[in-house]
């Protein structure tokens, strides 16, 4: 009965309760073992079931292997000894084959000569094995199993029984040949035990790890030679001696580890302690840990700590302490800006990380702030309190809300106040669409901008180049729109941009200079350098483009080109023939002289510059001009910088978006594709795009609409912010200037560029007394909505440029009593508005000295007043004129002369040297020696 394993004992070994009995029976069925509540198993069956439950290794039990009877022969104790090792799942199932002595066996066909039985040394102790290894492969049947201390202890007891059984086996073999098979089985079991011991030895060379170490009380003794026939028991070493050896061994190993040896060398110890090695137990293997729980009550183990990794633990503690110290330093307290004392109790409870008396000393890294940022966004990005930011701006004289935008100056002031390092970034870069330009750069035509002073013949010169007449069709003979044209010369194309020369079109000239490759400055030889000429040169210099001078009107008599060159040389533009680097080409727009020379110079300069661009991919263009045309809607003149713009492409330009419907060149011909440096008029826009905006082609309408909406929202919020944000100075000025006279106007123009020029010119007329208030401006005709905007305002005017109101609009204007003024020349519009502002302004009052009289005597007349007897010392004293009464050089009174008499007669005036009587209006405090000084006021009109 001692050889069978009871199911209840099996559960106890597993550490399971009776409630889990059903699960164990079910798992036994999976490997072909039928069990009941009171069943018993052979050790081999128990070992396989144990491995299946704990390790998940499924080994089927053959059906022809019946459970053994408890009343079996005592020889089964040999199997019990080995099965007890299998029960602990730690022994390898692939032992080596062992040679045995050959004996006559009737049931075996292949037999080998059996050698003398190998003596098995008794184990002195368990060997601790590492559960997991680095870079270990999953366990297989060839992987040695791990044997614990208690398992080896039990195995030793069984080995003693095996020795006794072997002696009995020899006797039984001699007496009864029928028991040969049983003896053979016993020998096999003995060989299995020997192989188990060999597998245990294989783990002795495992590298030691840092962590926990388990020291065993017993030691293992090497087996004697396998060829020895006799068996001898080795004497057991005492526990004190084992611990002494372990202590010496670990002292030596720790010394070696202190030298940072890669592998600890084997310590030289007594033979009993040579193979005693301890290894790190890895608790990450929950399966093995669970399997060893049943041996927790063993008392023959000592758990020691390996402090090899103590330095790592100390390092983590130091890092944690450093982080805590940093947090303590950053934790600051709010500073009260209104008093030197600390805050009141209520405020002191609010411990915010950014508030501290030393908060301004905290060094912060550079913070990226958008160029257009709201107050609350600035606070978030700078990690500041919103209330502190608003309060700081308030103390600086700026009243803002959290949604107001901050300008660049305000951002810099806040950064200085809070001791921040910031970098201001362009907000519009967030809206930029990433353009992927891949392809080969090809040669493109040069873009030439014609600039110069008004009436110097720019458009006439371009007309001569194009063999067209444009100048005569423009009102007043001056260019008021930006034009773009393509000209072919020597099989090469040149794109020309014609800019206005009037002072009101400064921004147009700037846009033309930004997109150009070469600037041609037209100067009239009979007029010389003018203000707009200098401005055009500044635009070209800012754009860093080469300049070619065209001396126009050379057909006129008495022209002096050397004088013109001298004026340009004073500005730093020296001619080539004077040793400089700038070409001065004499031309005549009237006769055409010098035109070919000018074009050749342009092409030579373009060849030197090697102008190239990528033609493949989405287009990127610049809007030169935008307008609204009847029947076509919003249109725009664009020049392509890179890529190709085709009919049907989706695009966006600032707040405008759409799909290209048609493209028309300067000759009025329809084209399908627009390559770099080419210009065309496109249709299909949702609205008129701002002049100078960048047009970008995208994949579809959805992307174009989304990008345009983002920009529209941003610009709208920015405009609202500017309308609400006001400083103390502006507020006080508004209160003081409540009598400010202004003229509300609505401006409508035919193109975006003209509208922009008119607005800028009118705003320059504003001064401290009168101002033009632009209520609304737009491109297109005058509508009823425009009338309703100004109907409630006094002195409101609607200004139209190159447009005419319809009959319905005229009738509504009469009904609303609104004045509509239309112009075709920008000169007339600006001059009339200047005159209108001058009429609202108070005149300039000047004084003119007329005479002076000295008081010699005074006469008090009852019910009349005091009459001063005077002698006129200078000029003429007239009745009704204004006079000052001066006493000791101080003006005592200012009033009018009510009565002037010569003796008893009333007179209008008294000349120098004559006596007269003077009585002032409502003033009688006149004394002898006072002086009357008379003057008259002269009103003069103001000028703007």
UniProtKB/Swiss-Prot annotation:
G2: annotated span: 477-481
Q: Does the keyword Magnesium apply?
A: no
Which GO molecular function annotation, any one, does this entry have?
A: translation initiation factor activity
UniProt main location, coarse = cytoplasm
- Could you tell me where the Basic residues compositional bias lies? 204-215
Q: Where do the record's region annotations for Disordered lie?
A: 61-157, 173-281
Biased composition annotated in UniProt, kind: Polar residues: 132-150
Q: What keywords were assigned to this record? A: Cytoplasm, GTP-binding, Initiation factor, Nucleotide-binding, Protein biosynthesis
Entry's Gene Ontology cellular component terms: cytoplasm; cytosol
The ranges of region (G4) come to 552-555
Query: What InterPro entries does the record point to?
Result: EF-G-like_DII (IPR053905), IF2_II (IPR044145), IF2_N (IPR006847), P-loop_NTPase (IPR027417), Small_GTP-bd (IPR005225), T_Tr_GTP-bd_dom (IPR000795), TF_IF2_bacterial-like (IPR000178), TIF_IF2 (IPR015760)
- Which superkingdom does the taxonomy of this entry point to? Bacteria
**Which CDD domains has this protein been placed in?**
IF2_eIF5B, IF2_mtIF2_II, mtIF2_IVc
Which residue ranges does the record assign to the tr-type G domain?
A: 443-612
* Basic and acidic residues composition bias: residue spans: 186-203, 244-259
Quote any Pfam family the record assigns. IF2_N
The Low complexity compositionally biased stretches are: 175-185
Q: Where is this region: G5?
A: 588-590
**What are the boundaries of the region G3?**
498-501
Residues of the region (G1) are 452-459
Job description of the protein: One of the essential components for the initiation of protein synthesis. Protects formylmethionyl-tRNA from spontaneous hydrolysis and promotes its binding to the 30S ribosomal subunits. Also involved in the hydrolysis of GTP during the formation of the 70S ribosomal complex.
Question: What family does this belong to?
Answer: Belongs to the TRAFAC class translation factor GTPase superfamily. Classic translation factor GTPase family. IF-2 subfamily.
Do you know which NCBIfam families this protein is assigned to?
IF-2, small_GTP
Stored HAMAP family: IF_2_B
UniProt-recorded name of the protein:
Translation initiation factor IF-2
Q: Which gene encodes it?
A: infB
């Amino acid at each position: 009965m001692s050889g069978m394993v009871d199911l209840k004992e099996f559960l106890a070994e597993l550490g399971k309760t009776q409630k889990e009995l059903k699960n164990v029976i079910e798992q036994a069925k999976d490997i072909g073992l039928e069990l009941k509540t009171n069943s018993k198993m052979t050790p081999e069956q128990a070992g396989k079931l144990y491995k299946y439950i704990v390790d998940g290794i499924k080994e089927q039990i053959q059906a022809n292997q019946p459970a053994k009877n408890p009343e079996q022969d005592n020889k089964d104790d040999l199997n019990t000894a080995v099965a007890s090792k299998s029960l602990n799942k730690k022994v390898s199932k692939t032992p080596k084959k062992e040679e045995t002595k050959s004996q006559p066996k009737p049931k075996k066909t292949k037999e080998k000569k059996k050698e003398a039985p190998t003596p098995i040394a008794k184990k002195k102790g368990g060997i601790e094995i590492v559960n997991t290894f680095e870079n270990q492969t999953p366990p297989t049947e060839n992987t040695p199993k791990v044997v614990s201390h208690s398992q080896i202890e039990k195995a030793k007891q069984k080995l003693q029984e095996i020795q006794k059984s072997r002696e009995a086996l020899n006797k039984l073999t001699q007496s009864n040949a029928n028991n040969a098979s049983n003896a053979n089985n016993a020998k096999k079991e003995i060989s299995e035990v020997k192989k188990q011991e060999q597998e245990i030895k294989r783990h002795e060379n495992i590298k030691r790890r840092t962590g926990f170490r388990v020291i065993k009380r017993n030691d293992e003794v090497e087996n004697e030679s396998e060829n020895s026939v006799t068996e001898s028991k080795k004497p057991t070493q005492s526990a004190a001696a084992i611990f002494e050896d372990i202590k010496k061994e670990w002292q030596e190993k720790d010394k070696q580890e202190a030298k940072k040896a890669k592998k600890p060398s084997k310590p030289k110890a007594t033979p009993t302690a040579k193979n005693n090695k301890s290894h790190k137990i890895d608790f990450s293997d929950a399966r093995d840990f669970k399997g060893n729980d049943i041996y927790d009550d063993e008392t023959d183990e000592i758990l020691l700590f390996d402090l090899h990794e103590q330095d790592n633990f100390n390092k983590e503690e130091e890092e944690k302490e450093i982080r805590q110290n940093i947090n303590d330093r950053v934790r600051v307290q709010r500073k009260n800006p209104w008093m030197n004392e600390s805050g009141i109790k209520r405020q002191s409870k609010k411990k915010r990380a950014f508030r501290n008396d030393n908060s301004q000393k905290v060094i912060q890294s550079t913070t990226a702030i958008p160029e257009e940022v709201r107050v609350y966004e600035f606070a978030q990005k700078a990690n500041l309190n919103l209330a502190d930011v608003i309060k700081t701006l308030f103390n600086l004289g700026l009243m803002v809300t959290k949604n107001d935008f901050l300008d660049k100056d305000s951002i810099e002031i806040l950064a200085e106040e809070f001791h921040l390092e910031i970098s201001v970034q362009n907000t519009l870069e967030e809206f930029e669409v990433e353009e992927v330009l891949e392809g080969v750069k090809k040669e493109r035509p040069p873009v030439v901008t014609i600039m110069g002073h008004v009436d110097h013949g720019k458009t006439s010169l371009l007309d001569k180049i194009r063999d067209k007449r444009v100048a005569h069709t423009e009102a007043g003979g001056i260019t008021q729109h930006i034009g773009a044209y393509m000209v072919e010369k020597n099989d090469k194309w040149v794109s020309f941009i014609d800019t206005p020369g009037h002072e009101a079109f400064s921004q147009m000239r700037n846009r033309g200079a930004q997109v150009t490759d070469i600037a041609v400055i037209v100067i009239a030889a009979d007029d010389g350098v003018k203000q707009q000429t200098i401005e055009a040169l500044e635009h070209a210099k800012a754009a860093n483009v080469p300049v070619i001078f065209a001396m126009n009107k050379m057909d006129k008599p008495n022209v002096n080109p050397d004088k013109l060159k001298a004026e340009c040389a004073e500005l730093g533009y020296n001619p080539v023939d004077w040793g400089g680097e700038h070409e001065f080409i004499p031309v005549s727009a009237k006769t055409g002289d010098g035109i070919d020379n000018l074009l050749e110079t342009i092409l030579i300069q373009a060849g030197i510059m090697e102008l190239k661009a990528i033609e493949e991919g989405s287009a990127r263009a610049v809007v030169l001009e935008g307008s609204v045309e009847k029947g076509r809607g919003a249109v725009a003149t664009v020049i392509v910088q890179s890529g190709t713009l085709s009919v049907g492409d989706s695009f966006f330009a600032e707040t405008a978006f759409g799909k290209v419907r048609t493209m028309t060149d300067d000759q009025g011909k329809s084209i399908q594709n627009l390559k770099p440096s080419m210009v065309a008029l496109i249709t299909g826009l949702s609205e008129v795009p701002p002049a100078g905006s960048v047009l970008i082609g995208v994949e579809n309408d959805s992307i174009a609409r989304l990008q345009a909406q983002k920009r529209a929202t941003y610009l709208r919020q920015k405009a609202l912010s500017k309308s609400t944000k006001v400083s103390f100075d502006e507020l006080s000025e508004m209160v003081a200037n409540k009598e400010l006279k202004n003229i509300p106007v609505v401006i409508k123009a035919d193109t975006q560029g003209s509208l922009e020029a008119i607005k800028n010119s009118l705003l320059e007329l504003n001064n401290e007394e009168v101002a033009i208030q632009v209520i609304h401006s737009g491109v297109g005709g005058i509508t009823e909505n425009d009338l309703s905007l100004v109907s409630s305002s006094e002195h409101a005017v609607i200004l139209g440029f190159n447009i005419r109101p319809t009959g319905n609009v005229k009738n509504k204007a009469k009904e609303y009593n609104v004045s509509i003024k239309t112009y075709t020349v920008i000169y007339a519009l600006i001059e009339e508005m200047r005159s209108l502002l001058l009429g609202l302004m108070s005149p300039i009052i000047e004084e003119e000295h007329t005479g002076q009289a000295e008081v010699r005597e005074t006469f008090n007349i009852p019910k009349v007043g005091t009459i001063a007897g005077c002698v006129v010392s200078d000029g003429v004293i007239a009745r009704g004129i204004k006079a000052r009464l001066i006493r000791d050089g101080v003006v005592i009174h200012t009033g009018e002369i009510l009565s002037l008499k010569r003796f008893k007669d009333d007179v209008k005036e008294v000349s120098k040297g004559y006596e007269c009587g003077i009585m002032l209006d409502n003033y009688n405090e006149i004394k002898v020696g006072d002086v009357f000084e008379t003057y008259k006021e002269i009103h003069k009109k103001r000028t703007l």
